[in-house]
Regions:
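Short, small-residue-biased leader/transition segments that mark boundaries at the very start
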Residues: 1-7
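Flexible, glycine-rich terminal cap/loop adjacent to redox cofactors
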Residues: 18-28, 33-133
Length: 133
């Protein structure tokens, strides 16, 4: 069926509602390499994001790590621990569904200051254009 063609288990966000929150989608670096993918990992700490600092100093704990295919810039996975990551993961879910690249993520305009800038920063860092790290 068409629904099963669209459904991909790897594209389902996994969320843990603890303090801090944890969220992931897709493969981590080890899983990508085991699958024979030439992958790289990019990490951005929340302490680099202004909104995380001005909202509450405890919000600046944690990080986001993106796994990207070196050959075609495809976002293979994302792991996050920190403030509101169970909300932030949805942007990556949509981007993966639409076969978006890390560059497209980085060039997407995000409100400033906002926690979602962490994923924009990941996309920029993956392409050597980071602003905050």
């Amino acid at each position: 069926s068409a629904a099963s063609d669209v459904y991909k288990r790897q594209l389902i966000p996994k969320c843990v509602y603890t303090n801090p929150e944890i969220a992931s989608i897709g493969k981590n670096l080890e899983q990508a390499k085991k699958a024979g993918i030439k992958a790289k990992s990019i990490k951005v700490p929340f302490k680099a994001i202004g909104k995380a600092i001005i909202e509450d100093v405890t919000q600046s704990k944690g990080f986001c790590e993106m796994v990207v295919n070196k050959d075609d810039d495809e976002i293979i996975g994302l792991n996050m621990i920190g403030p509101h990551v169970t909300e932030l993961i949805n942007e990556i879910s949509l981007l993966q569904f639409m076969n978006g690249s890390s560059l497209e993520l980085g060039l997407t305009t995000h409100a400033h200051p906002s926690l979602s800038e962490v994923v924009m920063e990941l996309g920029l860092k993956a392409n050597g254009q980071a602003i905050h790290v």
